[in-house]
Amino acid sequence: GSAGFKVVMTSDHGSKMVNRSTMVAADKYSSTGIRYKHGRNINASNKSAVDIRELYSYHLPALGHQTNYLLAKDDYYFLYPNEQRKYKNMLKGSFQHGGISMEEMMVPVLIMDPK
């Protein structure tokens, strides 16, 4: 108020309800994320994931030879073929983060300036 302070409020990014599973092919050294993975030559459907292989273009670290990143699109989540039965129903309808939806990428900011 009268002290002339400007107040800036923000929060962490949000999460996304996931409903569709997609298979990911990866070795045992790949990261374990549900909506984001990195590893050596990991693969998923282009319909369900963004596959980043030109790491320098995105300012991403190369964590080893042939490293790439997968980011889940829309309401997809990643499953390994050998764990499909175990996790598919458990994860469906849950809220996850790490993908590239607007809810996960945008951070709200409110600036209150006294008049």
Residue locations for each model-derived region?
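Feature captures the catalytic ectodomains and active-site-proximal regions of enzymes
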Residues: 1-115
